[in-house]
Amino acid sequence: MPRPALRSRSKKRKLVRTPGGRLALHVIDKKHDYPKCAICGRPIQGVPKLTSRLERRGVRMPTRPYGGYLCHECLRKGIKLSVWMSASKQE
């Protein structure tokens, strides 16, 4: 029986043939994909592929507004649109 930490179904299982000829079950973590932009779906630059739990604090997310949620181009378009809308409301 595997230990409780390895019973989670969120981990992948892989059958490995041992030198003795028997099959053993290895439990491995799933690979993570790059975070994607919420608008265009492109990978966000400056964000690592690991989970934030595994990374140190200085590497986790960009410090710009919406960092780790929007890519730089969508953020630029959104800021320009909000400035344009606020300017048109004042007129």
Swiss-Prot record:
GO-annotated biological processes: translation
In alphabetical order, the GO MF annotations are: structural constituent of ribosome
InterPro entries hit by this protein: Ribosomal_eL34, Ribosomal_eL34_C_sf, Ribosomal_eL34_CS, Ribosomal_L34e_arc-type
- PROSITE patterns documented for this protein: RIBOSOMAL_L34E
Spell out the GO cellular component terms annotated for this protein, sorted alphabetically and separated by semicolons: ribonucleoprotein complex; ribosome
Keyword annotations for this protein? Ribonucleoprotein, Ribosomal protein
Could you tell me which Pfam families the record lists for this protein? Ribosomal_L34e
What is the similarity comment for this entry? Belongs to the eukaryotic ribosomal protein eL34 family.
Q: What is this protein called?
A: Large ribosomal subunit protein eL34
- Can you name the source organism? Thermofilum pendens (strain DSM 2475 / Hrk 5)
